[in-house]
């Protein structure tokens, strides 16, 4: 079974993104078996960085899944694509 906790879409633009630094965070804490999936709607030179040093590039139709308590952050895009669109899904999988 699957229990959806939250689904949200994020859209960021490349206007002044070189000034934005996003902090590492977890989506939810203390949720057993909690997972986060990020679906990248479009390709750009941004992505998602993890506190453990891993980096996932924003590439169209890519889905990355990781434990909900793993610290991560948005890496803003600076290329000519005007927007970065992702869909975040937080859920519990038994």
Regions found by a protein language model. Give the residues of each.
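Fe(II)/2-oxoglutarate oxygenase catalytic core
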Residues: 1-63, 69, 74-86, 90-94
């Amino acid at each position: 079974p699957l229990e959806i906790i939250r689904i949200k879409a994020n859209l960021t633009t490349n206007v002044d993104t070189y000034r934005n630094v996003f902090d590492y965070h977890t989506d939810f804490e203390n949720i057993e078996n909690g997972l986060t999936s990020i679906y990248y709607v479009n390709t750009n030179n941004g992505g998602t960085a993890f506190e453990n040093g891993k980096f996932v590039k924003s590439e169209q139709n890519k889905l990355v899944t990781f434990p909900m308590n793993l610290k991560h952050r948005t890496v803003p895009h600076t290329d000519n694509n005007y927007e970065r669109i992702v869909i975040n899904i937080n859920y519990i999988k038994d």
